[in-house]
């Protein structure tokens, strides 16, 4: 019988952002079981479900870009998997996309190189973007862990701007690993000193480096 491997993308938003990685894993495995999806198990004395996840996000950080690979007995189309599993998941954790894997590819944790974060700030009409960017890129603690950052317009009002930041998740050459919680603490301190407010923040996407280009984990499938 032909078996199936699927890579899928899911959310961790609203109150679910306060769940730990292990709680998210348990909820997903329970949803797979309730959906009667015949998941494969590892061999040995203590078999585990063959489902792997991308890097855990810090508790309290919402994400629209969590990824997982799952091995299933029998043939199953990714679109059917998405529809079936979402019937067993809350909207806060629903699967947004899925693709069948036909070729051998690296694991998510071994392959993901960058994560994109969005920070929404209320500038109260102040034009401080260049100052903030200069302060961050001049910081010895964070400059080597950030791949890129830019300010973009927000659809939430003229006083709201979004800081679009891509940080490293693994060492490539001379970079450092981006530590979200440390950066958030620093960014809030910086914002308070300038009397601006950090309204919201979340993980927007994860990327894999392929031939000098940033691809999502589903792009390479």
Positions of the model-derived regions?
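Extended, well-folded interaction surfaces typified by the phenylalanyl-tRNA synthetase beta subunit core
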Residues: 3-4, 9-11, 15, 34
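Short beta-strand-to-loop capping motifs
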Residues: 10-12, 70-76, 119-124, 165-175
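Ordered, soluble secondary-structure elements with a strong preference for glycine-centered loop motifs
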Residues: 18-22, 75, 79-80, 126, ...
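Short, charge-patterned binding micro-sites
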Residues: 40-72
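Ordered, amphipathic secondary-structure segments that act as subunit-interaction surfaces
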Residues: 64-118
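Short, low-order "capping/linker" segments at domain edges
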Residues: 105-123, 207-221
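Core RNA-modification/binding signature centered on pseudouridine synthases
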Residues: 133-221
């Amino acid at each position: 019988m032909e078996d199936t491997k699927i890579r899928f993308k899911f959310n961790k938003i609203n109150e679910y952002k306060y769940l730990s990685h292990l709680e998210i894993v348990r909820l997903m495995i329970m949803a797979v079981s309730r959906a009667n999806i015949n998941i494969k198990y590892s061999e040995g004395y203590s078999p585990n479900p063959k489902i792997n996840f991308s890097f855990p996000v810090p508790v309290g950080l919402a994400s629209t870009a969590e990824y997982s690979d799952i091995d299933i007995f029998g043939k199953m189309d990714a679109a059917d998997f998405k529809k079936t599993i979402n019937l067993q998941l809350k909207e806060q954790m629903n699967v947004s996309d899925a693709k069948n894997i036909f070729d051998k590819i690296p694991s998510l944790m071994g392959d993901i190189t960058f994560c994109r974060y969005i920070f929404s700030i209320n500038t109260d009409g102040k034009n401080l973007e260049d100052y903030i960017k200069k302060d961050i890129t001049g910081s010895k603690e964070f400059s080597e862990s950030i791949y890129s950052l830019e300010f973009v317009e927000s659809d939430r009002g003229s006083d709201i701007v979004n800081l679009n930041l891509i940080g490293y998740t693994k060492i490539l050459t001379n970079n450092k690993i981006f530590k979200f919680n440390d950066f958030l603490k620093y960014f809030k301190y910086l914002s308070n000193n300038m009397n601006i407010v950090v309204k919201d923040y979340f993980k927007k996407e994860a990327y894999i480096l392929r031939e000098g280009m940033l691809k999502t984990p589903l792009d390479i499938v």
